[in-house]
Amino acid sequence: MAAPTYTWEYVTNLYGLGAPVITTLEATSGLYTKIGTLLVMSSGQVDEATASVVLPVGLAAETISVAATAADPVKVMLLRPGDVIKGTADADASSYSGFSGKLFDFNTDGSLDVADTSGGCASIWRTEDSGLTVFIVLTIFATS
């Protein structure tokens, strides 16, 4: 499976913390990433976030263009409470900006799933580009 179409970029931390730590974790077999791929933990190893992910761990800090084998090292930017990441929504999300109380999850292509407001993990802080560029804060993590 190829790396996702859409990736995320660290922007800031709302609590004034510095940039997140980048650490090396183990990859799952077959993992492909781009820098900024949203990642989750799966049986103690890092895997690409797919549809309906609600427990992310961080963002890929390196590109893996040849399928990883199980336990290959992969650099991951570990996300924390208050970290803002910027990415793409699959529809206009502007009506949800300003921490609307709705939580969203993600699509298989890596974009934010604006139509799904049940059981998600991402709250929208603000939007740009007619609501298609979103700045989100994750509310729960695999490390929580």
Language model features with spans:
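Surface-exposed, low-hydrophobicity beta-strand/loop segments enriched in small/polar/acidic residues
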Residues: 1-144
